[in-house]
Design a protein with these regions (language model features):
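Soluble accessory domains appended to multi-pass membrane transport proteins
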Residues: 1-80
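Long, non-transmembrane cytosolic or organellar matrix-exposed soluble domains/tails
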Residues: 65, 69-70, 77-176
Length: 176
């Protein structure tokens, strides 16, 4: 298929495939933009024993150390009563999981560190809290790209339980 473009004095013909395919071929990577849906009731503040457990995860141990120091300084400065976890600032399992995802993607040899990489929380829906992964693969070939995307999400789906989070699932129970 071709498309005709009128350019001032003459008409040019272009193959549609060449207009569509060129951007991907000339880019530095293929975009991965996909979400995990987290069950809202599984999100919670982290207790000190849970924080200590997560410090053993290499990718996030430095983050947890610096964040705990920052939070403790804030809570001390404002004389926050921490006998109630709800008071003051705290780490959440979902917040730490988002950092884990970003660090995992940064460390992955097949993601392109020169392009945008982020993990963000989108607006909650009736199907849960979307945690969106936005990054680029180094390899643009479709089957390799799909394999990489699957490998990343296999890992993340397996990692959810270590943060005491649950993925949203529609109930199979149907009552009349």
């Amino acid at each position: 298929m071709t498309i005709q473009l009128l350019q001032y004095q003459h008409i040019s013909l272009y193959l549609i495939h060449s207009l569509i395919g060129r951007g991907m071929e000339e880019s530095k990577g293929r975009r991965i933009k996909r979400s995990l849906l987290i069950k809202p009731s599984s999100v919670k503040f982290l207790e000190s024993n849970e924080i200590e457990k997560l410090k053993r995860v290499n990718l996030i141990s430095d983050y947890i150390d610096s964040r705990v120091t920052e939070i403790n300084e804030y809570n001390k400065k404002y004389d926050i009563d921490k006998s109630m976890l709800l008071n003051g600032r705290n780490l959440t399992n979902l917040g730490v999981f988002r950092i884990y995802i970003e660090e995992y993607l940064k460390a992955h040899p097949m993601t392109n560190e020169d392009l945008t990489l982020m993990c963000r929380q989108l607006e909650p829906t009736s199907q849960g809290i979307p945690i969106q992964i936005y990054t680029f693969s180094k390899d643009k070939e479709w089957t390799k790209y799909e394999g990489l995307t699957s490998d990343i999400f296999d890992h993340l789906l397996s990692s959810v339980k270590y943060f005491d989070l649950e993925c949203f699932e529609l109930s199979q129970n149907i009552s009349n």
